[in-house]
Amino acid sequence: IATQVDCSEHPKPACTLDYRPICGSDSKTYSNKCDFCNAVMDSNGTLTLSHFGKC
């Protein structure tokens, strides 16, 4: 099981509408890697991956 997501290409100005949910350490479900990685960048790295799938 992967415990990290590679956010090196983020943040991005726009994300696709793909639905591949990721649960963040803030107990929020992000709709895909792009949404999650943008939030990670906004949090200055304090947000981490909890698990793949809905929270």
Swiss-Prot record:
Cysteine pairings via disulfide bonds: 7-37, 15-34, 23-55
GO function term, MF aspect, one: serine-type endopeptidase inhibitor activity
Keywords, ordered alphabetically: Disulfide bond, Glycoprotein, Protease inhibitor, Repeat, Secreted, Serine protease inhibitor
Entry protein name: Ovomucoid
Organism domain of life: Eukaryota
Domain note: Avian ovomucoid consists of three homologous, tandem Kazal family inhibitory domains.
GO CC terms: extracellular region
Residues under site feature: Reactive bond 3: 17-18
Compartments, record wording: Secreted
Residue span, Kazal-like domain: 5-55
Organism for this UniProt entry: Dacelo novaeguineae
Pfam families from the UniProt entry: Kazal_1
Sites where a glycan is attached: 44
Classification via InterPro entries: Bifunctional_prot_inhibitor, Kazal_dom, Kazal_dom_sf, Prot_inh_Kazal-m
